Regions:
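Glycine/Thr-rich beta-alpha phosphate-binding loop at enzyme active sites
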Residues: 22, 26-29, 33-37, 173-186, ...
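Short beta-strand/loop segments at the ligand-binding rim of alpha/beta enzyme cores
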Residues: 49-56, 130-135, 200-219, 281-291
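Catalytic cores of alpha/beta
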Residues: 64-73, 219-233, 281-285, 295-312
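Glycine-rich phosphate-binding active-site loops on the catalytic face of alpha/beta enzymes
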Residues: 75-89, 170-172, 238-246, 294-295, ...
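A gly/proline- and charged-residue-enriched helix-loop-helix capping module
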Residues: 82, 86-132
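C-terminal helical cap(s) of enzyme catalytic domains, especially alpha/beta-barrels
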Residues: 88-104, 249-261, 317-334
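Active-site glycine- and acidic-residue-rich loops that bind
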Residues: 140-153, 186, 212-232
């Protein structure tokens, strides 16, 4: 079915098609037109959470939590929404989202466009989903990088009661200087502050909500060593590897290769897998890794698990393959 719809969607501007798809999914779910897919196909434990299966939706597709029920109906084992910031922000100027179909890639420089954490929480409260929900948090563009922890702490506190787990996004290339937070001292200070707040919130709410950190694929071995050391020392609950890449050399002379932003889809697969492999070796099963980046087939998902991931997430593959990709991944991981 999706193979018939995709050529029509791909005739439109990528961001307009994105909004149309979200609105259509939401409407179809409300009208009961989405066939319910059994998600309980391969129970998996992740960060102390019981997932019905290890295939999740990556952050970025549903930034405001407007389609939680619809995405859950597609058979995902867990759904991650966001990235969300304390205050609403428009993101970067349009156009800011580009398909690269010749390479099965997507370039985005969205810039954390979202309606803010309060609007997201209202959407969560209006949803019926009772499964595993991740909330991906970031900082506002206007917040100086030296005050970034303040934004993450605001989001953590507001999201805590509504999340199954929370992801700290420090790896988007589209917010100025954000990736600097992946450095040793900066990373340690930020994650320690968040872990301290997590302990306070766990006591106040009577429940423990795991904290994961999402990292970039554009890391050398020394940086991966630093990150592995920090996440183990502060006792993070998980890592998501990886975000989009700023390296567009795989696109060759393609006209879009000069566009600013992060590249996802098939072109990021090898870089993402290399970071996953190196990270898994250094973490040595001390905490779980969610593998994301370049999953375009069931075989790609299985490769992430083989390299050390406990679960996987998809986004760009869903744009190119549709819901069939979820079924294919689940079949490959049985």
């Amino acid at each position: 079915m999706y193979s018939l719809v995709r050529p029509i969607l791909f005739r439109f501007d990528a961001e307009k098609a994105h909004h149309f798809t979200l609105n259509s999914l939401r409407t179809a779910e409300k009208l009961g037109l989405l066939p319910k897919v059994d998600s309980h196909t391969r129970p998996t434990e992740l960060m102390g959470l019981q997932l019905p299966n290890p295939v999740g939706l990556a952050a970025g597709l549903d930034k405001n939590g407007e389609c939680i029920d619809a995405f859950a109906a597609l058979g995902f084992g867990f759904v991650e929404i966001g990235t969300v910031t304390p205050k609403p922000q428009p993101g970067n100027p349009q156009p800011r989202l580009f398909r690269v179909p010749e390479h099965q890639g997507i370039i985005n420089r969205m810039g954390f466009n979202n309606h803010g954490i309060d609007a997201m929480i209202r959407n969560i409260e209006n949803s019926r989903f009772k499964g595993i929900l991740g909330i991906n948090i970031g900082k506002n563009a206007v917040t100086p990088i030296e005050n970034a922890a303040d934004d993450y702490l605001i989001c953590l506190e507001k999201a805590y009661a509504h999340a199954s787990y929370i992801t700290v996004n420090i790896s988007s290339p589209n917010t100025k200087n954000l990736r600097a937070l992946q450095g040793g001292d900066e990373l340690s200070a930020l994650l320690e502050a968040l872990k301290n707040k997590q302990a306070q919130l766990a006591a106040a709410h009577g429940k423990y909500v795991p904290l994961a950190v999402k990292i970039a694929p554009d890391l050398d071995e020394a940086q991966i060593d630093d990150i592995a050391h920090v996440v183990k020392s502060v006792e993070m609950d998980g890592i998501i590897a990886t975000n989009t890449t700023i390296d567009k050399s795989s696109l060759g002379s393609h006209p879009l290769a000069s566009e600013q932003g992060g590249l996802s889809g098939l072109p990021v697969r090898e870089k993402s897998n290399q970071v996953l492999k190196l990270l898994a070796e250094r973490i040595d099963s001390k905490l779980p890794i969610i593998g994301v980046g370049g999953i375009m087939s069931g075989a790609d998902a299985a490769e992430k698990i083989r390299l050390g991931a406990s679960a996987v997430q998809v986004y760009s593959g869903l744009i190119y393959r549709g819901p069939e990709l979820i079924k294919e991944c689940l079949a490959a991981l049985k």
